[in-house]
């Protein structure tokens, strides 16, 4: 509560927004039109949408001057999804615009979460976003393959899955 978080483009972050819709006193910065729609009608959520051109395929906005739009903005947490996760290639994306957004947000947030649905493991997309051992946490719907779990554990990357969250409740 009361933190400013960023929810990036993609359907995975949209589902995070839906899960947050019942929370009170949250503040969300996003460029994801689905996220803005999911949270925008809630009186207990403050939602700010980044301006700019709308990318209709991904349903997100891209500011003309990203650095100017985000100058002086600091976020407690940021949530991004990716198109592929590979042990050797790291996190990969299909959209160059998301790469610039990620790098800018990553530099201005306290804690980064990579939201990865289970279909993205052992896949590579067009371009590299970052290595798997970057400073972050992972959220996924199912347990990742064993080689990913071992990799993350050996580097101190916190992994949240449906089963670990259910155990904590």
Model-predicted regions and their roles:
Residues 33-169:
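Conserved phosphate- and dinucleotide-binding cores of soluble alpha/beta proteins
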Residues 19-24, 39, 43:
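Active-site catalytic pocket residues across diverse enzymes, especially alpha/beta-hydrolases
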Residues 1-22, 28-31:
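Helix-turn-helix/homeodomain-like alpha-helical modules used for DNA recognition
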